[in-house]
Amino acid sequence: MAVNRDPILKRCRYLGISPTVVGINKESFRKPNANGRKKVSEYGLQLKEKQKLKFIYGVLEKPFYHYYEIATKMEGQAGNNLITCLETRLDNVIFRMGMAQTRRDSRQVVTHGHFLVNGHRVDIPSYRVKVGDVITIRDKSKNSVKFKEILDKTNGRLIPKWLEANKEEYTAKVVALPGIEDVDYEVAPHLIVELYSK
């Protein structure tokens, strides 16, 4: 799998997001555009919003465009639907549960088969959950020191209202579909829709 190896703090600063959004408990004290960059064009703004979402969720261009295509066919606003598609990825759900420190880590634990959806093992990070799905950890993994340490590190992470989580039991239930109002970062997804619509 291709990985963007640019320094995370540098990317966060460029995209104007807090490192905590991607699970890094560090802050960059230099504000984005602190070096006095020239005014960004409309295309530049659209491209930056796309880069922001791809970076946050660790999704490459081809699957990202596929999510856009799905979003345009769903009811409602395509931009909001795009957020829904990304937030309901299994690797993101594991991250939101606090069962992984970063989304990159969550992709790894999903790939290694540590989690079940409705009692069935799912090892595909891009698997999309739906309302009513119950995500649990395998019994064999539940007693792992690794996951107990992860929960200690992510203890202060807020679990979104669309997930009904029980950290003691390592479980979560999807009680609603997430939307743009549920994310912990600022984004203008309509700019991405405009970019792809050209």
What does each model-found stretch correspond to?
Residues 1-97, 124-198:
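Ferredoxin-like alpha/beta domains used as RNA- or RNAP-binding modules
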Residues 96, 111-112:
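The C-terminal cap of the DNA-recognition helix in HTH/winged-HTH DNA-binding domains
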Residues 105-107, 194:
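Short, hydrophobic/aromatic-rich beta-strand segments within well-structured domains
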Residues 100-103:
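Beta-rich strand-turn-strand
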Residues 109-110, 129:
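Short, well-ordered loop/turn sites that connect or cap secondary structure elements
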